[in-house]
Amino acid sequence: MSFAMLRPAAGRYLYPEISMLSEDEENGSESSGSDEKPFHLDADGFGIKAGKRRSGKKAGRLHREPRQRHTANARERDRTNSVNTAFTALRTLIPTEPADRKLSKIETLRLASSYISHLGNVLLVGEACGDGQPCHTSPAFFHHGGGGGSPPPRDSENSQPKQICTFCLSNQRKLSKDRDRKTAIRS
């Protein structure tokens, strides 16, 4: 006696009239909450004539969806291009060291925020700060109208490390380079 091993044929070959529902068709019916995909059985699969054929509606949707997708992709490309152009413009306004340093988007935003704070301090302090670092002026300067109050106690000054403003530091380096050049020229 001989036995033959048969593999089961794929369902799409045995039952070509059964197809998966698209997301639009699926959303029109109630969901059972399971992850199973519902199936659709064409009426002509059993020899029953249906009054309305779905293929015409489906074919129209297939032509419309790529066009909508292309326009959505074009809008997204335009939006991304606009955002990148704005970041490029912002990068040109922020001083960096070295000057040709490439900044990421998050670095650009953080440096822009820091630079705005620095410029605000420069406007508040003005030329009253002699060391070229308006961001390091003590809080008493701001509260008492120009440093007329007593300086803060030494203990509180030494308890926390001094914060360094990148832009003040950069400005201070430029000033010291200028002084060094002037000194070298005079010598």
UniProtKB/Swiss-Prot annotation:
Pfam families (alphabetical): HLH
Domain bHLH: 67-119
Stretches for region Disordered: 21-83, 140-163
UniProt keyword annotations, A-Z: Activator, Developmental protein, DNA-binding, Nucleus, Transcription, Transcription regulation
GO terms, molecular function: DNA-binding transcription factor activity, RNA polymerase II-specific; protein dimerization activity; RNA polymerase II transcription regulatory region sequence-specific DNA binding
Biased composition (Basic and acidic residues): 34-43
PROSITE patterns: BHLH
Subcellular location: Nucleus
GO terms classed as biological process: cellular response to BMP stimulus; cellular response to fibroblast growth factor stimulus; developmental process; regulation of transcription by RNA polymerase II; sclerotome development; tendon development
Tissue: Expressed in the intersomitic, the superficial proximomedial limb mesenchyme and the subectodermal mesenchyme.
SMART domains in alphabetical order: HLH
Compositional bias segments (type: Basic residues): 50-72
GO cellular component: nucleus
UniProt subunit comment: Efficient DNA binding requires dimerization with another bHLH protein. Dimerizes and binds the E-box consensus sequence with E12.
PANTHER family the record matches: BASIC HELIX-LOOP-HELIX TRANSCRIPTION FACTOR SCLERAXIS, BASIC HELIX-LOOP-HELIX TRANSCRIPTION FACTOR, TWIST
Biological role stated in the UniProt entry: Plays an early essential role in mesoderm formation, as well as a later role in formation of somite-derived chondrogenic lineages.
Record's protein name: Basic helix-loop-helix transcription factor scleraxis
Organism, as annotated: Gallus gallus
